[in-house]
From Swiss-Prot:
Protein name as annotated: Bifunctional enzyme NodQ
Residues that coordinate or bind GTP: 16-23, 95-99, 150-153
UniProt subunit comment: Sulfate-activating enzymes, NodP and NodQ, may be physically associated.
Described purpose of this protein according to its UniProt entry: Proposed to provide activated sulfate for transfer to Nod factor. ATP sulfurylase may be the GTPase, regulating ATP sulfurylase activity.
Pfam family, one: GTP-eEF1A_C
Gene3D superfamilies cross-referenced by the UniProt entry: P-loop containing nucleotide triphosphate hydrolases, Translation factors
SUPFAM superfamilies hit by this protein: EF-Tu/eEF-1alpha/eIF2-gamma C-terminal domain (SSF50465), P-loop containing nucleoside triphosphate hydrolases (SSF52540), Translation proteins (SSF50447)
Gene of this entry: nodQ
Catalytic activity: sulfate + ATP + H(+) = adenosine 5'-phosphosulfate + diphosphate; adenosine 5'-phosphosulfate + ATP = 3'-phosphoadenylyl sulfate + ADP + H(+)
Amino acid sequence: METGTGRGLLRFLTCGSVDDGKSTLIGRLLHDAGLISDDQLEQARRDSRGRAEEDGGIDFSLLVDGLEAEREQSITIDVAYRYFATDRRSFIVADAPGHEQYTRNMATAASGASLAVLLVDARKGLLTQTRRHAIVASLMGIRHVVLAVNKMDLVEDGETVFAAIRQAFTVFSAPLGFRSVTAIPLSARHGDNVVHRSAAMPWHHGPTLLGHLETAAAEDDPTEDGPLRFLVEWVNRPNLDFRGLSGTLLSGSLETGGAVTVWPSGRSARIARIVTFDGDVTQARAGDAVTVTLDAAVDAGRGDLLSGPDGAPEVADQFAAHLLWMAEEPLIPGRSYLLRAGARWVPATVTALRHAVNVETLEHGAASVLGLNAVGLCNLSTAAPLAFDPYEASRHTGSFILVDRFSNRTVGAGMIRHPLRRAANLHRQELAVSTVERAALKRQRPAVLWFTGLSGSGKSTIANRVERRLHTLGHHTMMLDGDNVRLGLNRDLGFTDADRVENIRRVGEVAKLMTEAGLIVLCAFIAPFRAEREAVRALLPDGAFLEVFVDTPLDECMRRDPKGLYAKARAGTLRNFTGVDSPYEAPDAPELRLDTTAEDADALAERVVELLHRKGIAEA
């Protein structure tokens, strides 16, 4: 199919609630514009038997829905992409699913589009999912919307119905920042106002859908007018004599001899060479994929950002961002994730959930967690500084995803609003005495020994005996026990999932400080969630976190019940008790597993001490 020769490429998506006719609309548009081949048309006719009674028996949604499950259920599940072109323009359209459970798919499509065709069923008006898709489109940086009021052939007094829906959306979308909203009444099934103007709606004097798409001022090509942004995607080292930084020029322009700054380090250099597949060039424009070499030995690597001497990006390790949550498990502030921004990976924590957005009213409400498909404004903290622009200024350098550490699933999509200025005023103080020097004085290697298991499993009993044994051997230790910490430092926390996460986060930071003093730190905490235990591990150097799973069966813990807590939990007087009405996630690969039903506490403590000897943490 030949490329259009008019305004260039337009990326747009169709979105809206389920059964509003998104796939049918795209199929009809392609059909009426003469962009469907004969063999595709014949295949659609065969597949439409028993499903369509008009227009030659064609179900136009079949021209877009590609998955077998989509065709069987007459719904869209995955995002379907189609390229097409007219004499005036070329297009890439993304057909997004309407079901709430597939909102994450819609968000993925929206992140690469510059215009949204938001469908509304004329019979139903604005629905919750319609509003949710409008919010997601706005958050993803889409500034131009076509409000396509579909199925106009199924309503009486269409002009009044259309006007009411247009007014309702105008009021709802006012805070969303759209630069243009064009409302078009249409019938995808019959082709009214899709490509050709409809005689059935003589009161509509605006454009057809295709006519508007061909002329919409919603370009999404990289711009040379913006500040220089070159994202390093990989370091090119074909031999010992060449080291290049390969990536895509997102905006601005590059030229040999030009000054650049590498972020987040802030080191400066000049462009020595610009290398392409066809050889060296002296200039590169926005959108070009090139390899550049620098005239100085500047530390620059994958995930770094190059800018010009003017227009530097923001650099911070704390920032505010809108977050679209995509996982079944809710977002809990304090939990650690992996954050990917461009080609850079860094551990990150959502430190605060400032508010959640009500998709019906756009009101901001207090929330302690963020559920599936919910949108909220959060504060995030990263383990290392990031270079970025606000998402409003650049989608490429202002977006990120959050990834679960265990499943490697993408759980959230983020749009950065601004850095938290308080972070810019904090600087890590270099200490005169190092951790290594403190540890050498004590003849030991600092580490965290983390005892995890159900209440009543024997964690504290074994940890106390391990500490006594280490003290006898002349080692310097500190014991942190769950109840003791909750009586002081964490007395403000309860036992909800969010409070449990914060409890372990604080303990992890305290334990880290104690290892910097050269101590062997013994922590006896239920710590029911794997993610939090792994977050503590990530705070420490490799080999400095040893997980000891005190693996006592629940029935045995209930039988022991040394504090009477299980009896209270089973009677309903104690809520959120681990093992009864709150989950416990056992370690997958602990450094040591202890079975308290097979050996006594002294023998198990000796096994722990032997582990420390083998690891070189404590001398025998």
